[in-house]
Amino acid sequence: SCANRLLLLPNGYNEDIFYPEEVDRESLFDSLGLPYRGEYIVLFAGKLAEFKGVDTLLRVAHRYERLTEREIVTLIAGDGEEREKLSDLHKLLGLRHTFFLGNQKQDELWRLYNAADVFVMPSRREPFGLVALEAMACGLPVVGSNEGGLPEFINSSVGTLVSSNDEDAFCGAILEELAHSREAPERRAFVARYARENFAQELFVTKLEDVYASVLS
């Protein structure tokens, strides 16, 4: 049957652009016009659309800004139709350490991925989630929602998946990642290696060529 002949190939990321390297956080923050005092960095990157769940991240940030003594800054890279609504929610929640960065070029995203301590993807729906894979390629663990394509490449060795509407679970998973993020550099190395060995664009191209060869033979 046709169903038995279907082959699903995951997207690959560009390993020439996204790879692990130490980044000077103070210099990065200076280029963003933000002060840096050694805070832990929570990062989101993506379109500011309803299905991306950035409103969930803002409410979760409100929790960890109030509930923990750990200094945490939340950076939101991207733009979209929800920007004004999210800015209003940001003001309503009184978030003091959460910042909208607007759209960022790929080289700036690379710096952000390498500087951050955890990447958060609270999507309500997510076909695949390439930005999460790019973050992992830089060694960044992911806390994401158990939706769409994210479970295809995120497991407990490289991150945490929770229900998209469980803000308590998101907050707990983020704080758990931050508790160990700077004490275990080998974790970042493992995350980057996992991404490179399983999802690099070069592997995707090779697999696709193999598929075409098998069809044409």
Task: Outline where the language-model segments fall.
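Short hydrophobic beta-strand element within catalytic cores of glycosyltransferases
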Residues: 141-144
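Aromatic "clamp/platform" in nucleotide-sugar-dependent glycosyltransferases that forms part
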Residues: 124
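Conserved donor-binding/catalytic core segment of Leloir-type glycosyltransferases
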Residues: 36-52, 58-61
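Conserved acidic donor-binding segment of nucleotide-sugar-dependent glycosyltransferases
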Residues: 156, 160-167, 176-182
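Short alpha-helical donor nucleotide-sugar binding micro-motif in glycosyltransferases
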Residues: 103-104, 111-116
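Nucleotide-activated donor-binding/catalytic signature segment of Leloir-type glycosyltransferases, i.e.
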Residues: 87-104
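Carbohydrate-associated surface elements
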Residues: 12
